[in-house]
């Protein structure tokens, strides 16, 4: 088994960015991570990521430049980025590739995530207690 190390990190600032999509913010974060690692996008051999708001987060590799790398879509609510990082690390650990990148990206409107938390398996009392609200700016 191969050792795994995080060699670069990128983060888009938190906040409200009118006119900028979640995918565009994800691209900025991924480019920052690649630069932080001292690499080029063409050095990345695989990616994993997910999003609540973007139905096709794998399309982000096309925004960065199609290089033919595999992209694993994950969805695990607020733990999606952590699940993507684990999927990426597992691929490296198992020897599938040497350099991977993980991304989690979302852009929520102000207020409740959905009108009905039951749509995502949450009980109604979750919303009734005010526990289903996005951060307000």
Report each predicted region and the residues it spans.
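Conserved "HGTGT" condensation-loop signature of ketosynthase/thiolase-family condensing enzymes
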Residues: 1-75, 90-94, 105-137
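Short acidic donor-binding loop at the edge of a beta-strand
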Residues: 98-99
């Amino acid at each position: 088994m191969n050792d795994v190390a995080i060699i670069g990190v990128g983060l888009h600032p938190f906040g409200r960015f009118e006119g900028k999509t979640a995918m565009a913010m994800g691209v900025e974060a991924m480019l920052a991570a690649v630069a932080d690692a001292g690499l080029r996008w063409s050095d990345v051999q695989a990616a994993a990521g997910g999003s609540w708001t973007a139905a096709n987060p794998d399309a982000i590799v096309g925004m960065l430049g199609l290089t033919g790398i595999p992209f694993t879509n994950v969805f695990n609510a607020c733990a999606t980025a952590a699940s993507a990082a684990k999927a990426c690390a597992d691929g490296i650990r198992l020897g599938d590739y040497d350099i991977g990148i993980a991304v989690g990206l979302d852009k929520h409107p102000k207020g409740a995530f959905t009108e009905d938390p039951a749509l995502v398996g949450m009980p109604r009392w979750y919303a009734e207690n005010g526990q289903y609200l996005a951060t307000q700016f």
